[in-house]
From Swiss-Prot:
Keywords: Chemotaxis, Cytoplasm, Hydrolase, Phosphoprotein. The keyword Acetylation does not apply. Phosphorylated by CheA. Phosphorylation of the N-terminal regulatory domain activates the methylesterase activity. Belongs to the CheB family. The modification 4-aspartylphosphate is found at D59. Signal peptide: none annotated. Residues 152-337 form the CheB-type methylesterase domain. One of its GO terms (molecular function) is protein-glutamate methylesterase activity. This is Protein-glutamate methylesterase/protein-glutamine glutaminase 3. It comes from Myxococcus xanthus (strain DK1622).
Length: 355
């Protein structure tokens, strides 16, 4: 897309007040032009086809055709980059958000729950920034055919895996977790960048697609094989030398931090740690994945063809944290093949590298 041309945005919200506010906040960014507004899902589908916007901001609780239904129709008829803007306080809205991600939405953002003008303006700048980033993402209406996966690494088997994801991550995680068996012999830790307020909804949604129990980790909890753990909203998830989960408030940057999580796995488990970086913008996860590789552990990153956004996997390749990209469809098998089938022991194995 030419840098001179404005980013054309379609705003979809059934509340005229909210639509007016979103329009005003977005157009404070000189690069953005709001070209249309829709108050229901059917009108959104019509305007997406007529206007061909670069980005659509989509509410979910819409009259008639709801948000996920509208997104599915748009992605099949006139694909666009879709940014969900929904009320976090409403559980149905949160749950619909992950249905929207499955239908093709790229990102979830909670509606502002503020009355202070300065805080509202700050939220608006973050929204506009997200729209500008989304405008650079290639529109994907159909997943390309996966390439052949590399053979699994030989050597030490893995006792714990950490997975990092951002834009496009929830559907990718659902795809991977749905193919892992209940007998998975290791704990699986997830750092998915997401707006505060959506984590519990993501846990509920993923629990419906995988045989593995999915939960939010508690500080000091002993990690169990065959379970999936997410951090508490606004926190990073780490592992200590005894194999216990540790939560700490995020210190800025991507939240939760994939680098923080993966680095803790490398320190605690050494050559028996494993890390995966999936689709996403930016560079989070690359340093942590490199720490695992330097400790002798197993590392994978998603390939470009199956990534919604190749930024994070590319960063992992650039720092040589992994040798080549892996098709998303091959990731579950590689994770399984890398796991030890001995009992999970927790902590650094005997003979692992020193800190």
């Amino acid at each position: 897309m030419s840098v001179q041309r404005p980013i054309r945005v379609l705003v979809v919200d059934d509340s005229p007040t909210m639509a007016n506010m979103l329009t005003a906040l977005l157009t404070e960014e000189p690069r953005i032009e709001v070209v249309g507004r829709a108050g229901d899902g059917n009108r959104a589908v019509q305007l997406a086809r007529l206007l061909r916007p670069d980005v659509i901001t989509m509410d979910l609780l819409l009259p008639g055709l709801d948000g996920p239904g509208a997104i599915a129709a748009i992605m099949s008829q006139s694909p666009a980059r879709i940014l969900v803007v929904s009320a976090v306080a409403e559980q149905r809205g949160v749950d619909l958000g992950f249905q929207a991600m499955s239908a093709g939405a790229l990102e979830l953002i909670g509606k502002p729950n503020v009355t202070n003008a300065e805080e509202l303006r700050r939220w608006g700048k973050e929204l506009a920034h997200s729209v500008c980033l989304m405008a650079e993402v290639p529109v994907i209406s159909r997943r390309p055919r996966a390439a052949t996966a590399p053979p699994p690494p030989t050597g030490a088997r893995v006792d714990i895996f950490g997975v990092v994801a951002s834009t496009g991550g929830p559907p990718a995680l659902a795809d991977v977790l749905s193919k892992l068996p209940r007998s998975l012999p290791v704990p699986l830790l997830i750092a998915q960048h997401i707006t505060v307020g959506f984590t519990q909804g993501m846990v509920r949604w993923l629990s419906q697609v995988t045989p593995l129990p999915v939960s939010i980790a508690k500080d000091g909890e002993r990690l169990e094989p065959g379970r999936v753990y997410f951090p508490l909203d606004g926190h990073d998830l780490l592992v200590d030398a005894a194999g216990l989960a540790r939560l700490q408030p995020s210190q800025g940057g991507p939240c939760p931090s994939g680098d923080v999580m993966l680095t803790s796995l490398a320190a605690a488990f050494g050559r028996r740690s494993g890390g995966v970086v999936l689709t996403g913008m930016g560079e989070d996860g690359a340093r942590g994945l490199l720490a695992i590789r330097r400790a002798g552990g197993v590392t994978f990153s998603q390939d470009e063809a199956s990534s919604v956004v190749f930024g994070m996997p590319r960063a992992a390749l650039d720092v040589k944290a992994t040798d080549q990209g892996v098709p998303l469809a091959s990731m579950p098998e590689l994770i399984l093949q890398s796991c030890t089938f001995a009992p999970f022991r927790g902590g650094r194995p005997e003979g692992g590298p020193t800190r």
